[in-house]
């Protein structure tokens, strides 16, 4: 194989791995909540809080992707969308902030002549499930990770949103959404 071909394959592999950068997924259930009682949902009031990032604020493409991914995953878990008297209200929030990685700074005893800090975009998506009757938060799940180069590319963003939402909602408690 020619050196240029090897270099191209290596660069594409590195690019692909960047797209699959580590995403941290977390969730919690409100204590005392009987999560098995919830079967239907509807979208709660629109989130009016802005992120300060024009790539997300008032971005209908992004909003539609998040909402479609949430609905698809909830439906797969047995939830039904309700037009009247839902059990749950769904809300989400997304943010992007620039973070700095001081490459090698986390290993103070390792000599590194070529360690340089670099700035990257870190994204967070939070999905809240709220009891529609009491208006109390029942469950929250979120994903955090590098989205460098993703947020400015619609196809990549759609893929990462789908993956993040699926992984967030995988953490719903057993029995939530399914008929007993």
Question: Which ranges hold each PLM region?
Answer:
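Surface-exposed short loop/turn segments
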Residues: 23-24, 77, 87-138
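Extracytoplasmic/periplasmic, Sec-exported soluble proteins
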Residues: 35, 54, 58-66, 82, ...
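Sec/Tat-exported extracytoplasmic proteins
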Residues: 66, 70-81, 94, 129, ...
């Amino acid at each position: 194989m020619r050196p240029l071909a090897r270099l191209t394959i290596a660069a594409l592999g590195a690019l692909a791995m960047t797209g699959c950068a580590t995403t941290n997924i977390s969730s919690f259930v409100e204590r005392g909540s009987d999560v098995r009682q919830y079967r239907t949902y509807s979208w709660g009031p629109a989130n009016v809080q802005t992120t300060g990032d024009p790539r997300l604020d008032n971005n209908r493409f992004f909003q539609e992707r998040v909402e479609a991914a949430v609905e698809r995953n909830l439906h797969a878990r047995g939830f039904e969308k309700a037009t009247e008297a839902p059990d749950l209200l769904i809300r989400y929030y997304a943010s992007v902030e620039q973070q700095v990685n001081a490459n090698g700074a986390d290993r103070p005893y390792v000599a590194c002549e070529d360690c340089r800090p670099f700035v990257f975009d870190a994204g967070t998506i939070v999905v809240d499930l709220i009891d529609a009757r009491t208006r109390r938060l029942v469950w929250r799940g979120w994903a955090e990770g590098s989205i460098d180069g993703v947020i400015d590319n619609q196809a990549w963003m759609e893929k990462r949103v789908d993956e993040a939402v699926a992984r967030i909602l995988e953490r719903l408690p057993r029995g939530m959404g399914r008929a007993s």
